[in-house]
């Protein structure tokens, strides 16, 4: 795991702080609900970050619910690396999920050295790209880019369409008075162990917090079957997370 830990550090160190700042008056002609979301998420004058480093804790469903702590680095136009630590049967387990430079992978080790799970290939990469798209809500400066196409949806929903390493993503964001309440998208996956296909995936945002001029989701419930709340609660939800720290660069 040492090499992969260095990868997270090197990914973070590869980014230099940018000089451009957020000017709400410079936003293009957008639906009012989109403008309200972006100006709520990013304070006027805040640097337009190209990366964020997150420290988090929560519970993850691996057989049963287990506590974890993790760090994650997200970099615009490159992807993300997520490192987690938890315990199973009293033994330390370390996991890594990544989508970086067009390739996705998952690796979990017991006691640092015994492989528990390895996964990669086209299906994993496509699924990881969907995760990276959804997690743009933790780096909302991504959504200010000129290559994001916004449109208003039904009710309080707005849609952001953009590409993640050439793969189209269509995020649905439920926004009320600028605050994000949920995010969802069709994500490639096989949560039931069957063939990979597009499955509704998303997160409910229960709390937000402000770090360095960015107001981002700080407590979330994440899972599959997002179009069916009962099924989401019963079998789709697999991740509950709280953000402890966010550093933008």
Which residues are covered by each model-predicted region?
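N-terminal leader/targeting segments and the immediate start of mature chains
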Residues: 1-53
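N-terminal mature ectodomain segment of secretory-pathway/periplasmic proteins
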Residues: 36-113
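Short beta-strand segments that buttress and anchor functional surface loops
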Residues: 54-61, 82-87, 158-165, 185, ...
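Charge-dense polyanion-binding interfaces
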Residues: 55-66, 237-249
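Short, solvent-exposed coil/turn segments at beta-strand boundaries
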Residues: 71-83, 95-108, 153-157, 173-181, ...
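Short, solvent-exposed aromatic-acidic interface loops
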Residues: 86-91, 109-116, 185-190, 222-227
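Flexible, processing/modification-adjacent segments and terminal tails
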Residues: 107-167
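Gly/Pro-enriched, hydrophobic low-complexity segments
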Residues: 160-248
């Amino acid at each position: 795991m040492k090499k992969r830990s260095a990868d997270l550090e090197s990914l973070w160190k590869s980014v230099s702080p940018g000089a451009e700042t957020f000017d709400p008056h410079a936003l293009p002609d957008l639906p009012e609900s989109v403008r309200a979301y972006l100006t709520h998420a990013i304070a006027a004058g805040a640097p337009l970050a190209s990366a964020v480093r997150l420290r988090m804790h929560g519970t993850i469903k691996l057989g049963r619910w287990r506590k974890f702590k993790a760090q994650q680095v997200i970099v615009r136009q490159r992807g993300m690396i997520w490192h987690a630590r938890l315990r199973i049967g009293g033994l330390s387990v370390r996991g890594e999920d990544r989508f970086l430079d067009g390739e996705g992978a998952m690796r979990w080790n017991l006691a640092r050295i015994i492989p528990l799970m390895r996964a990669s290939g086209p299906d994993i990469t496509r699924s990881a790209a969907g995760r990276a798209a959804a997690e743009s809500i933790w780096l909302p400066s991504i959504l200010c880019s000129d290559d994001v196409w916004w449109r208003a949806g039904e009710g309080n929903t707005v849609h952001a369409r953009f590409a993640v390493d050439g793969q189209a993503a269509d995020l649905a964001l439920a926004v009320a008075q600028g605050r994000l309440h949920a995010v969802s998208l069709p994500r490639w996956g096989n949560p039931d162990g069957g063939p990979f296909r597009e499955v509704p995936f998303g997160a409910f945002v229960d709390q937000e917090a402000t770090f360095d001029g960015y107001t981002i989701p700080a407590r979330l419930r994440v899972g599959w079957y997002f179009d069916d709340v009962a099924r989401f609660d019963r079998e789709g939800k697999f991740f509950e997370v709280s953000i402890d720290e966010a550093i933008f660069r």
